[in-house]
Amino acid sequence: MSIAQRIRVLAVLLCSLSLLVSFPVKAADNNSDYDIAIDLATMLQSARSVIGENQELINDPAIGDKGLTGAVVQARAIEKYTKAKGGAAPDLTSDDLKSRLLRAQVEAIHQVVEDNQDTINQPDIAFKGFVPAVFARLVNEEFQRNMGEEAEVKVTAPPELIRNRKARPDDWEVEAIRNDLSAPGWEKGAVFSAEAEKDGRPAFRVLVPEYYGQGCLACHGSPKGELDVTGYPKEGGKVGDLGGVI
């Protein structure tokens, strides 16, 4: 689906996600429910950062073919993931749950970029709406179509920051965001996890908090209420504020 047709559906987060891994997933070490969730979040963050770093290129009206193909973004995302994991490249060939989920995720990354080549390469158009938040949402939707019975990745945020109705937190997420991730004593960057139902099914749920960086403030900073480039009012956020959750 063309991003140009969906500019008004920009999600709030250039920096966030909520992740659910359904049972049964019990394993040891780096194949635990928790580690699978963290790895999926890390891969999504890695791919999203590639799109973020290429915003100037994507929105350059003077360039047609940007060379930013699905294969290029996928490869760069894997490189960033590997660096974030201390040099451990993802295993995308095994049949265990983690490998299957990561493989489906990198395939979704490739597919979304390929589906939006016309938008990315459209000449004589500056802002195209193919921003990290929209990219992440489309990747999550593609991933869910293929792996929704086993895992789900979602980008959400505190309710007052939600711009896209699809990203609204459910009741469990709202409670965890308000009572844990937003609590004064919560260690910044600490991940929240718990066994809790999702849509009537048992699941292991992991919330990875993300905080506004300087680059987020162009759309989510001050002055509060001023319209950003997407046409949404800014939230008045500051660097370090909780901006969302994977």
Placement of each model-derived feature along the sequence:
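Sec/Tat signal peptide C-region and signal peptidase I cleavage site
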Residues: V21-A27
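The canonical Cys-X-X-Cys-His
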Residues: Y212-K224
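Bacterial N-terminal signal peptides that target proteins for export
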Residues: S2-V12
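General helical secondary-structure elements
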Residues: S2-A4, S22, L44, V174
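Bacterial N-terminal signal peptides
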Residues: A11-V21
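Extracytoplasmic c-type cytochrome modules immediately beyond a signal peptide or single-pass transmembrane anchor
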Residues: A27-Y211, G225-I246
